Amino acid sequence: MRIAVIATYTHPTRLRIKEPSIMQSSVPELIAGLCPEHAEVEVFNEKEVDIPLDRHWDLVFFSYLHSYYEHTKVLSTLFRQRGMTTVAGGRHATHFPDDVALYFDAVITGEPESNVPALIADFDKGQLQKRYERPSLGPTAIQPYRYELIDFTNNKVRLPGIEASRGCPFRCNFCVLTGHERYRYRPVAQVIDEIQTRMRWNPNYLGLMKDAFIFLDNNLGGSPKYLRELCEALIPLKKTWGCALTFNVLKDASLVNLMAKAGCRYVYTGLESLNPESIKAMNKGQNTLSEVDAVIRRTFSAGILLSFGLIVGSDGDTNEYLEKIPEYLADLQYFSVTFLGIVSPYPETPFFRELQAEDRLLPGTVSRDYDGYTLCHRPKNLHPSEVVDHFHRLCAQLGSLPNIARHYWSKLTLSNLPRYKQTILFAGPEILSIRNPLKNPARRYIAGMDALEDWDTKQMAALGLQPQRIT
């Protein structure tokens, strides 16, 4: 049996651009680890490589985000026309299983560990079902990834990734996890064994990235007690790692120091906003803005690069606040912003339901618009065009070369811990990527006003496919 596992991708500019980076989706390696030993499995990440459309597999699994749906169903339709069986899974497929079933032979609406082996067994017997929604087997069922399938020549800066936990205990109103997943975590011994015995390391750059990896968890700090136990177990391994976690974890100085001792050199946290009204509107009470400066200084002093994501377009945002964001950031000397987006009301979130009830969703939105860069609603205090104008300006300012120079100058000498300076240097391209939305000057970044990618538009017309309309 020949199986392909494909993580699809379309660039937020809607141009045909690849985006190799340190952190990539590891869903293909996860699914591959659930396939039977007799299967010949290939994995593809479209951020790194094109999908070979002339190849043939018996079974093709697709992993995708909401905004990649139109592109993914084009690929599925092309493969099905040539006799291949296609499968879709993920959050979009779980929320829209009936629509997805029109373009794929089977839909997985549950966790992969309980559903992928069952689906493959049914396919082998010629008894494939249309939908697989078996209950979760719990975090102990997470299998080691097929790290040996990662081709580091396609992405020279990529780090291997691992999951220690899933879900998040918080209830931010715009987050796709809210109301759908409880927080759960794997036994620490299981995680450590996978790192020691299964993980494969990036050999590029004269070994500078050897023994470095990323935790792919949505929130590695969902249980501070668990994180402490994990860090204690990581210390003897002498590895270098990064993770994403919520801001509240970083208020604990002893835990931050323990993370650094365990090899943590990079933390990403969704601060989202420096405006108290916006934080309140997001139901993100774990972000205490009065402590931001102290948390930043504490984390960098420990030898950890702290990176933030900011979003604009929230209901608390005003013209005055958005105008002053660069000033606020200048006051936070060591602040690093590596993601800048527009808040997106994903259809399965409380934010979407709130906007729907208030008739504030913009008309003509399609699944492609839910990419974290396109305004899909009318904010309370701003006209849609004002949001986009501020977004463009901030992309240019925060992603500028002078800002990257300040990033290097202010942070390189803050710590002498191993690989700290290396982490600071590798973060430069991340900051520069904030400028990506400016690469397509024709892009409006308002739902319903931008065409799909040229290739997808042509293929959909030829195949008789229509975009999925959300409003």
Feature annotation, model-predicted:
Residues 34-40, 237, 295-306, 332, ...:
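A structural motif corresponding to the C-terminal end of an alpha-helix
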Residues 99-118, 258-267, 324-340:
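Structural recognition of alpha->loop->beta junctions
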Residues 52, 57-66, 228-234, 300, ...:
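Short, electropositive alpha-helical surface patch
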Residues 144-307, 312-314, 320-322, 327:
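Radical SAM [4Fe-4S] cluster-binding motif and immediate context
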Residues 1-210:
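Acidic, low-complexity intrinsically disordered segments
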Residues 2-8, 17, 37-43, 123, ...:
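Radical SAM enzyme core and accessory elements
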Residues 10-14, 99, 277, 281-282, ...:
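Flexible glycine/acidic-rich beta-alpha junction loops that bind and position SAM and/or redox cofactors
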Residues 87, 108, 242-244, 307, ...:
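Structural detector of well-ordered beta-strand residues that form the stable sheet scaffold
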